[in-house]
């Protein structure tokens, strides 16, 4: 039986959970003290830490519990972060309030203070003119076992239901499930998925079943659904997953959304900044320079 709305839990009879628990118990009986120590060291290495990048000191409290938050915008992936850099962060003064430092099989966040489009990072900013507005640019991969840690340290266990969350991310068009051939689709294109408490108008069609979302974006939306926080995910399906100007500009319909339109001032200037970002990326990606 399929779920009828986002967040519905559909239970099916299955012995897999019991068998997995039995296997874990058997494994723990076979483990030597050295095995357990290796596991502890690996778990410690995979911890997600929130800190101030300039001083490398840990944040003492949950990020959004320290500051009142009315609006939280999260960009996941290089194209989504480039969109925020060009069209949103250009229109105001943003102050860095922290970053997530993490390690996993696919990425290691950078320690550099001056970030470039090719760096791997997860940085949080606060709007100086309205300190209740927060923004996160996350170009790194956050593994499944690290996502709850990230949510715990950013949102906490008692998040404010008065805030609104907007998430931007991309997936390859081959992940889009449709009766038609994906070759006939004009990419890039946007789809949206929202929590039940999100009531604003959407900037694109809703994501059709049986499509699903993945990774940190899915974790954030699930968290907001559970805590009844108004949230929307805008998913851009594209055939180019590297930094790409056409894919970045596919997010432009969001500039008229309630959460972003008050943050954007000069679109022509933002377009020029996007061109410079693309040029910088091309230079850094060229093995001959």
Swiss-Prot record:
Task: Provide the species name.
Answer: Mus musculus
The identity of this protein, by name, is: Proteasome assembly chaperone 1
Organs and tissues of expression: Highly expressed in testis with moderate expression in brain, liver and kidney and low levels in heart, skeletal muscle and pancreas.
Which Gene Ontology cellular component annotation is one that this UniProt entry carries? Answer: endoplasmic reticulum
* Taxonomy, superkingdom: Eukaryota
Question: Which family does the entry's similarity section mention?
Answer: Belongs to the PSMG1 family.
Q: Report the protein's function.
A: Chaperone protein which promotes assembly of the 20S proteasome as part of a heterodimer with PSMG2. The PSMG1-PSMG2 heterodimer binds to the PSMA5 and PSMA7 proteasome subunits, promotes assembly of the proteasome alpha subunits into the heteroheptameric alpha ring and prevents alpha ring dimerization.
- Pfam families, A to Z: PAC1
Q: Name one GO biological process term.
A: proteasome core complex assembly
- Sites of Phosphothreonine modification: 18, 55
User: Which residues are reported to carry the modification N6-acetyllysine?
Assistant: 265
Q: Where is the composition biased (Basic and acidic residues)?
A: 27-38
* The UniProt record lists the keyword Nucleus: no
InterPro entries per the UniProt record, alphabetical: Proteasome_assmbl_chp_1 (IPR016565)
Q: Name one GO molecular function term.
A: proteasome binding
Instruction: List every position bearing N-acetylalanine.
Output: 2
Q: Give the UniProt keywords, A-Z.
A: Acetylation, Chaperone, Cytoplasm, Endoplasmic reticulum, Phosphoprotein
Q: Where is this region: Disordered?
A: 1-38
Modified positions (Phosphoserine) are 181
> Mostly located where?
cytoplasm
- Summarize subunit and interaction data from the UniProt record for this chain: Forms a heterodimer with PSMG2. The PSMG1-PSMG2 heterodimer interacts directly with the PSMA5 and PSMA7 proteasome alpha subunits.
The yes or no answer to whether the keyword Chaperone is present is yes
- State where the protein is found: Cytoplasm; Endoplasmic reticulum
Q: How is it modified after translation?
A: Degraded by the proteasome upon completion of 20S proteasome maturation.
């Amino acid at each position: 039986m399929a779920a009828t709305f986002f967040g519905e839990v559909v239970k099916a009879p299955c012995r897999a959970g019991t068998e997995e628990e039995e296997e874990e118990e058997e494994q723990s009986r076979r483990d030597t003290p050295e095995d357990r120590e290796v596991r502890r060291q690996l778990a410690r290495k995979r911890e997600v830490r929130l800190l101030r990048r300039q001083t490398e000191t840990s944040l003492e409290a949950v990020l959004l519990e320290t500051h009142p938050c009315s609006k939280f915008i999260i960009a996941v992936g290089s194209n989504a972060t480039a969109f925020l850099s060009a069209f949103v962060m250009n229109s105001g003064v943003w102050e860095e309030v922290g970053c997530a430092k993490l390690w996993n099989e696919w990425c290691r966040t950078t320690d550099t203070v001056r970030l470039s489009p090719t760096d791997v990072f997860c940085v949080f900013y606060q709007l100086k003119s309205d300190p209740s507005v927060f923004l996160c640019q996350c170009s790194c991969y956050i593994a499944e076992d690290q996502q709850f840690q990230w949510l715990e340290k950013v949102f906490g266990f008692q998040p404010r239901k008065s805030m609104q969350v907007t998430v931007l991310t991309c997936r390859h068009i081959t992940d889009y499930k449709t009766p038609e051939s994906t070759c006939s689709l004009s990419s890039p294109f946007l789809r949206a998925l929202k929590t039940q408490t999100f009531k604003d108008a959407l900037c694109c069609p809703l994501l059709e079943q049986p499509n699903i979302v993945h990774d940190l974006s899915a974790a954030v939306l699930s968290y907001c659904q559970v805590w009844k926080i108004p949230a929307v995910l805008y998913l851009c399906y594209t055939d180019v997953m590297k930094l790409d100007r056409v894919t970045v500009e596919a997010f432009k319909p969001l500039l008229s959304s309630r959460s972003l339109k008050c943050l954007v001032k000069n679109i022509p200037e933002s377009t020029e900044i996007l061109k410079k970002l693309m040029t910088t990326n091309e230079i850094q990606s060229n093995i001959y320079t």
